[in-house]
Regions:
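PPIase-associated folding chaperone regions across multiple families
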Residues: 1-64, 106-184, 208, 228-310
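An amphipathic alpha-helix/helix-turn recognition signal
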Residues: 64, 68-71, 181, 202
Length: 310
């Protein structure tokens, strides 16, 4: 069934006009906004009594906290209007928490409802009351992810530490030895490619032969439409280096997820990320509708033989 479903998803294609129309009808789902805000908490904190039990604040204490939050928020708003930076304004108040959102997304709360309003202009500043809390919000810009995604191939030489005892005296020595071994293997693989045909196809053959990445070692190590932040930091930074050109190769090392050495081949740029996001959303919507249509008229019945099963 999964192959049948995937075949249907893969068959879905959309014209540029259809993608643009869907985007324009669902901008909030795809746009990102650059804004800052200061959060002023309008409720009092709970405390502990002598026995360590939690004591909730009284109505009077909460009312006082809200009054203080309102006063501080209004004062901060005025200070920012007069030219003080948001972060510095927040620092003037114990209950003011500053947040910078250079690529904020819409969530439907009071702040993002204001930020993502179509009428927003650069430099707009406001005070928002939401429940017991207050927010001073400064808007900078809004737009879609216009940068191009990238296509890359890679060969992973994984540093396997699953059988090592991190508390053992010789742990670091063994770890360093395994790192050195995998680094040497990565360098040897790149050298083999450089001494061969030096083509994308020859790199793909090596990936199928050598890569420890089970997610790509049957398709030549290929990842398409990679977006910023999708891969581990070192991999990401190499792929999105502004100087990167088709046919570039390199080796990066990362720790954590997929610890090891990545031999990378840069295939080239692909569709803008916003288009990738929109197409994926359209596919998800169409697949859901298709799947619902498949099962809506199905009625489950229990065969008589089921009663004999124990």
């Amino acid at each position: 069934a999964s192959h049948y479903q995937q075949d249907y998803i893969d068959s879905l294609t959309y014209t540029d006009e259809e993608v643009a129309t869907y985007y324009n009808e669902h901008k909030n789902n795809f746009d990102v906004a650059d804004y800052e805000y200061i959060y002023f908490k309008g409720t009092a904190d709970s405390t502990k009594d002598a026995d360590g039990n939690t004591v909730e604040p009284t109505d009077e204490e909460n009312a006082a906290a809200k009054e203080a939050a309102s006063a501080n928020a209004n004062a901060a708003l005025e200070a920012v209007r007069n030219g003080l930076l948001m972060e510095k304004a927040a620092g003037n108040y114990d209950n003011g928490t500053y947040t910078d959102r250079p690529t904020g997304t819409y969530s439907g709360d009071a702040v993002t409802e204001w930020v993502f309003n179509e009428e927003r202009q650069e430099g707009d500043l406001t005070l928002i009351e939401s429940g017991d809390n207050y927010y001073v919000v400064l808007f900078h810009s809004r737009g879609r992810n216009d940068y191009n995604t990238v296509d890359v191939r890679h060969i992973l030489f994984k540093v396997d530490t699953s059988d090592l005892d991190s508390k053992a005296d010789d742990y670091q020595e063994k770890l360093d030895a395994r790192k050195a071994e995998q680094k040497e293997a990565a360098e040897a693989a790149l050298k083999k490619w450089e001494e061969g045909a030096r083509t994308e196809d020859s790199f793909a053959e090596l990936a199928n032969e050598l890569s420890a990445d089970t997610g790509s070692n049957t398709n030549g190590g290929l990842y398409t439409e990679v977006y910023k932040g999708q891969m581990v930091t070192e991999f990401n930074d190499w792929c999105f280096d502004e100087s990167r050109q088709p046919g570039d190769t390199g080796i990066v090392y990362n720790e954590g997820s997929y610890t090891g050495y990545h031999v990378i081949y840069f295939v080239g740029t692909d569709a803008p990320y916003w288009q990738v996001q929109v197409r994926n959303a359209m596919k998800n919507a169409d697949y859901t509708q298709w799947n619902n249509d498949l099962v809506k008229d199905i009625t489950a019945t229990e065969a008589s033989g089921m009663k004999y099963l124990v």
